Curated annotation (Swiss-Prot):
One of its GO terms (cellular component) is cytoplasm. Cleaves peptides in various proteins in a process that requires ATP hydrolysis. Has a chymotrypsin-like activity. Plays a major role in the degradation of misfolded proteins. This is ATP-dependent Clp protease proteolytic subunit. Belongs to the peptidase S14 family. GO terms for molecular function: ATP-dependent peptidase activity; ATPase binding; serine-type endopeptidase activity.
Amino acid sequence: MKDPIETYMNLVPMVVEQTSRGERAYDIFSRLLKERIIFLNGPVHDGMSSLIVAQLLHLEAENPAKEISMYINSPGGVVTSGLSIYDTMQYIKPKVSTLVIGQAASMGSLLLTAGEAGMRFSLPNSRVMVHQPSGGYQGQATDIMIHAAETQKLKDRLNEIYVKHTGQTMKKVVDALERDNFMSPEEAKEFGLIDEIVENRSKDDAET
């Protein structure tokens, strides 16, 4: 028997839009995509990254000059999956603004700070967490050493990305990511992970 809570969480609301050709129904995420809003919600894994990357590429093809908004509520996840989203954000022509709602932890925080400079935001009660990558391996000793070396390479690369987008020194980034480091929006702004804390939608946004 399915968990009723899981079933409820898998239900996607539908919205109906009136057009000149009559009514048209969209799932809520497709409707947001029409407004160039991508909602990154939940753990980052290969399935999610393929969907996010596809949406980014679709919106670029639709209008390469128009901004894309990415709303993030994620506990993090698989590093390589997150890096595929990160690389696509940097690769495409449209500017990508980011906004954390709820939490941006681990890989979620990296995607948050990867937004266009000056366009990285947080709602006032969101939380941001940074840390170093983790992994558990078993098998032959040589294989464990190979995986440990790869994890170290990923750690070094992630540190470089945080340095690039926060403006902090490598030492400060390494120290900050040594353990789970939870930040308020104010602390995240001071560290350079975000640019502004927003409580209300701006007048210009409300009119668009």
